[in-house]
Amino acid sequence: MSFVDGSVIVAILNEEPGFEELEKRLSDADGKLCVSPLVRFEAVAALTRLRIIATKGKADRSDLIGEARELVDSFIQALSASEVTIDSHTGVRALDAMARYGKVAGHPAALNLGDCFAYAAAKESGLTLIYKGNDFSQTDLG
C-alpha cells in the first residue's frame, strides 16, 4: 500500500513536467493507494491557485474551487484510493516530522505543513510514500 502526496495529484492534473512518470508510479504501486483529507484539501487549493493565476484573477473563485474539487475528487475516485484518518496520533507524528525534517528545523528536506502530515500519515499507517520532488527523498521515507 502507498500514500499519495498532494503534489502528485496536482502535477498529474496540471500535466506538469514529469507527470507521466508519476502516473506510472501510481499504476505500478503495489496494492491499495491512500490519501488523507489534508491531501485532498492541498490539491484543491493548489489547483485553484494555478487557475487563478492562469485567468489573471478574472474568473469567479468559487467556480474555480468547485471545478478543482471535482477534478481532485474524480482523480481520487479513479485511483480507488481510500482515505486515512488524521487523528491526534497523526498530529503528534507530524510535529515530530517538523522537528526532524521541517523548514523550521533547518533540515534540507524543508518539509512544510502538508508534507509533515503526509509523512506522518504514511509513517503511522506503514505505507510507502508516492511524492513529487526531492523533499521526501531526504527523509527516512525517501
UniProtKB/Swiss-Prot annotation:
Coiled coil: none annotated. InterPro entries: PIN-like_dom_sf (IPR029060), PIN_dom (IPR002716), VapC_family (IPR022907). GO terms for molecular function: magnesium ion binding; RNA nuclease activity. This is VapC ribonuclease R02377. The lineage of its organism: Bacteria, Pseudomonadati, Pseudomonadota, Alphaproteobacteria, Hyphomicrobiales. The keyword Nuclease applies. CDD domains: PIN_MtVapC28-VapC30-like (cd09871). Mg(2+) binds at residues 5, 115. Pfam families: PIN. It comes from Rhizobium meliloti (strain 1021). Residues 3-140 form the PINc domain. Keywords: Hydrolase, Magnesium, Metal-binding, Nuclease, Toxin-antitoxin system.
